[in-house]
């Protein structure tokens, strides 16, 4: 009899923001649940992964981040030394875990992970969630990684697989999650609810617009669940207005929301669309313009609207929200458009590709 194989071991790399971490964890769960894999997450001490990864039951190993300066400065001079240190750390993690494969999702830890995997002869995959690929992921494919894209024309070679999202967010309406949300945030079931979030750090422009629009929104019978960001001061709660620093239970938040106002990071767009929630996207006005592109397909499908950051005044916010929430037919049409534009099980597809490449 042949001896049984050792369990599949995979390292996922995608630290920093939730947009990098959540797809990594979705794939980690698909590998664990579908293939019995041991999955280790690679991250840094400064990212959200320090809480998100352990909370989801995975081991987290830390390395030094390697941000690439966009302009010549002292950090650029230090870059080769930082890369060398992070590469050594990443190689050690791959050896310690006996990794059979690596999957990177962009961010500061991905480049060292790609370099380490190549140097050790370990197959590796590069997932790009944004409509425009980042530098670390482009490097990963050039190094021999298998490219996996969320959308066409990202500028990175590879097949289109969509964005991995948590299974519990892909099932649409969830009465249990909605009741949990109403209980923990004190929301009323018979009032329309607008969820507002600027991401884990919050958004000054979105927060300011909400502050100026609040009287009109509440006066129209709309209740607002507002994640202001961990670093921002918490506004005073009012009847119908629930400000919180950050929302851990996004399943419940999506379940109670009739409409969401948020940035259009790739992961956010994927989760919101899968949850069937009409959206008003306010793209981050920085970077290479990928946030506007991330939302372009769902906007074209009629599932969302876009408001430029510079145009987000309190008056514009009130107008857009009331146009959607105040019209049940519009809400229904946008929700249906969101559900029909959702991509399939990207996490399962990626897990299958990884397991096959590793010989499992």
UniProtKB/Swiss-Prot annotation:
Record-linked CDD domains: GT28_MurG (cd03785)
GO biological process, one term: lipid glycosylation
Topology relative to the membrane: Peripheral membrane protein
GO cellular component, as recorded: plasma membrane
Binding residues annotated for UDP-N-acetyl-alpha-D-glucosamine, in chain numbering: 17-19, 130, 166, 200, 247, 291
Catalytic activity annotation: di-trans,octa-cis-undecaprenyl diphospho-N-acetyl-alpha-D-muramoyl-L-alanyl-D-glutamyl-meso-2,6-diaminopimeloyl-D-alanyl-D-alanine + UDP-N-acetyl-alpha-D-glucosamine = di-trans,octa-cis-undecaprenyl diphospho-[N-acetyl-alpha-D-glucosaminyl-(1->4)]-N-acetyl-alpha-D-muramoyl-L-alanyl-D-glutamyl-meso-2,6-diaminopimeloyl-D-alanyl-D-alanine + UDP + H(+)
Swiss-Prot/TrEMBL keywords: Cell cycle, Cell division, Cell membrane, Cell shape, Cell wall biogenesis/degradation, Glycosyltransferase, Membrane, Peptidoglycan synthesis, Transferase
Keyword RNA-binding found: no
GO molecular function list: UDP-N-acetyl-D-glucosamine:N-acetylmuramoyl-L-alanyl-D-glutamyl-meso-2,6-diaminopimelyl-D-alanyl-D-alanine-diphosphoundecaprenol 4-beta-N-acetylglucosaminlytransferase activity; undecaprenyldiphospho-muramoylpentapeptide beta-N-acetylglucosaminyltransferase activity
E.C. designation(s): 2.4.1.227
Pathway: Cell wall biogenesis; peptidoglycan biosynthesis
Subcellular location: Cell membrane
Keyword Nucleotide-binding among UniProt keywords: no
Family annotation (Pfam families): Glyco_tran_28_C, Glyco_transf_28
Name of the top EC class for this enzyme: transferase
Protein function: Cell wall formation. Catalyzes the transfer of a GlcNAc subunit on undecaprenyl-pyrophosphoryl-MurNAc-pentapeptide (lipid intermediate I) to form undecaprenyl-pyrophosphoryl-MurNAc-(pentapeptide)GlcNAc (lipid intermediate II).
UniProt similarity note: Belongs to the glycosyltransferase 28 family. MurG subfamily.
Name the record gives this protein: UDP-N-acetylglucosamine--N-acetylmuramyl-(pentapeptide) pyrophosphoryl-undecaprenol N-acetylglucosamine transferase
Organism: Corynebacterium efficiens (strain DSM 44549 / YS-314 / AJ 12310 / JCM 11189 / NBRC 100395)
